[in-house]
């Protein structure tokens, strides 16, 4: 982090590896249990020599390929917009960045510039999670291509998004018993807050009639890792052939 704060690195794609871009590696941690080992492996071989003065080419290529926003800019443009639920939650206005900046206005564990300057391991530098930032148009070459910066900012300021959910309607549809619903909730999912899931599916929530499969056997990548098993479980719960406490 100290090296990148003082000397951002040019990447083979033409983008720039800054300290803030490096912290976006945190996004991969919830993708699969094996990603923790992969991240540890690449970080242990990041420098060419023990003096931590020069990055290996393999590390720089890894950083280029592990964060695929250049190949998938629509993910960057619409990541926050998919949560814009009508005029109640519009515009998105770079909400993750706004929340981060609010956190670091005073000394905070979230301030990577502060924690990276400390010698003590008691205040480790924290990775970012599944979020996007306006500065990505500067660090990722394709995200800041012709017209892309203006497009990203215009989407962040868009105020006329339609409604995503009708909580009352969902509650009514599930309440009459003709429509059945089942859902998986991963206890250790770093992308989806467990308590919010319990609020939505609990008593009084719009999905209170949903049968809930709560497990810590999987992370966010459950469908990718064991999709057929999870689908069979949920289908059985919804159809009544598999009984669960919920």
Residue ranges and their predicted role:
Residues 7-162:
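Alpha/beta-hydrolase fold active-site neighborhood
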Residues 174-185:
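Short beta-strand/loop motif that positions the catalytic acidic residue
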Residues 32-33, 188-191:
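Acidic catalytic loop of the alpha/beta-hydrolase fold
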């Amino acid at each position: 982090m100290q090296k990148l704060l003082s000397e951002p690195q040019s990447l083979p794609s033409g983008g720039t590896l800054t300290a803030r871009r490096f912290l976006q590696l945190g996004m991969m941690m919830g993708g699969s249990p094996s990603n923790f080992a992969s991240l540890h492996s690449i970080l242990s071989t990041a420098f060419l020599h023990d003096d931590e003065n020069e990055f290996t080419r393999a590390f720089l290529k890894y950083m280029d390929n592990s964060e695929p926003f250049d190949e998938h800019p629509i993910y960057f443009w619409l990541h926050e917009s998919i949560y814009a639920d009508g005029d109640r939650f519009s515009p998105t206005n770079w909400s993750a960045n706004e929340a981060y900046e609010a956190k670091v206005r005073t000394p905070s564990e979230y301030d990577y510039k502060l924690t990276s300057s400390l010698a003590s391991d008691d205040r480790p530098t924290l990775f970012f999670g599944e979020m996007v930032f306006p500065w990505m148009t500067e660090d990722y070459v394709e995200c800041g291509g012709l017209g892309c910066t203006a497009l990203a900012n215009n989407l962040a300021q868009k105020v006329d998004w339609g409604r995503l959910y009708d909580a009352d309607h969902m509650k009514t549809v599930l309440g009459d018993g003709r429509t059945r619903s089942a859902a998986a909730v991963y206890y250790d999912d770093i992308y989806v807050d467990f308590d919010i899931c319990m609020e939505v599916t609990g008593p009084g929530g719009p999905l209170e009639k949903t049968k809930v499969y709560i497990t810590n056997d999987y992370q966010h990548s459950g469908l990718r890792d064991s999709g057929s098993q999870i689908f069979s479980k949920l289908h059985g719960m919804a159809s009544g052939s598999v009984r669960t406490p919920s």
